[in-house]
């Protein structure tokens, strides 16, 4: 089965695990998924990442992060730029998620970065997703 949107698949797996409060999520590995997950790790939305080989397929195991009494750290995830409708922004148009409380992940010429880093670098790019 061919996956047309691996980032949407990643976000959906995380969203579903978050709803039922799973501790661990496993996703097939790719360079762009690793970059998105590293940003989520730096921003404090997930606990840790572990890459491993499952036969011929490389996988990523990520540990979900919850607060006291299993409160969700991730309130929402939204895919913005999709294969059928790409969404780009110039450096002046970089979105703020919930007035800066959330994070926009943007694919730029300098790599995959958060909205704050893109503003600091002075670059625009493709808006991959919002996390809050």
Curated annotation (Swiss-Prot):
Transmembrane segments: none
Entry keyword annotation includes Chloroplast: no
GO cellular component: ribonucleoprotein complex; ribosome
Keyword hit for Translocase: no
One of the GO BP terms on file: translation
Top-level taxon of the source organism: Bacteria
Pfam families: Ribosomal_S8
Molecular function GO labels: rRNA binding; structural constituent of ribosome
Keywords from the named record: Ribonucleoprotein, Ribosomal protein, RNA-binding, rRNA-binding
Record NCBIfam families: PRK00136.1
Family: Belongs to the universal ribosomal protein uS8 family.
Subunit organization: Part of the 30S ribosomal subunit. Contacts proteins S5 and S12.
Function per UniProt: One of the primary rRNA binding proteins, it binds directly to 16S rRNA central domain where it helps coordinate assembly of the platform of the 30S subunit.
Name of protein: Small ribosomal subunit protein uS8
């Amino acid at each position: 089965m061919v996956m047309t949107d691996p980032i949407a698949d990643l976000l959906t797996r995380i969203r579903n695990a978050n709803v039922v409060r799973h501790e661990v999520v496993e996703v097939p590995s790719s360079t762009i998924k690793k970059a998105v997950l590293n940003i989520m790790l730096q921003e404090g939305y997930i606990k840790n990442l572990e890459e491993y080989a499952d036969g011929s397929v490389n996988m990523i195991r990520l540990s979900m992060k919850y607060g006291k009494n299993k409160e969700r750290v991730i309130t929402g995830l939204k895919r913005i730029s999709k294969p059928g409708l790409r969404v780009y922004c110039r450096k002046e148009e970089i979105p703020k998620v919930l007035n800066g409380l959330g994070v926009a992940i943007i694919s730029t010429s300098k790599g995959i970065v958060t909205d704050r880093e893109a503003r600091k670098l002075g670059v625009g790019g493709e808006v991959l997703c919002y996390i809050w």
